[in-house]
Amino acid sequence: IPTRGFLGYRGEFIIDTRGEGIIYSQVIGFRPYIGEIEHRVVGSMVSMATGKALGYSLWNLQERGVLYIGAGKEVYEGMVIGNVSKGYDISVNPTKGKQLTNMRSKSSDEAITLIPPVELTLEMGLEIMNEDEYLEVAPKSVRLRKKFLTETDRARFKRQK
């Protein structure tokens, strides 16, 4: 396996072995480029709204896949906020709040418990990034975003392709 094949594998290895595995690599020599390395195809959860991510909407979205952001984070249209195991992207609204009513009942006021989001690192971002995405590296954060931020631009590009 070439060295570029190990890019991002460390995190997956730790999850697979539950932290008990030992990984070892050795340089045998240099060889010419053979071709692309296949990787697992995952889809992205793409924000379709700009604003502050709310706990209620993230609570509903965490059932669909793994989230990269927590409640209270600023999001913008076209930002990748998580991934889904399906092979295609889905547009979601992480800024949607709970509908307020005058009725009070025990069943409607459930406590929201969020699964802690996965902290996106530079290595992980390079591993899971698709061809139609950019990796934004800022001093305080690492984010994924689509090349075309609006949903209409992404659909137009897909049709031309």
Feature-to-residue mapping (PLM):
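Accessory interaction regions appended to the cores of large information-processing enzymes
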Residues: I1-K161
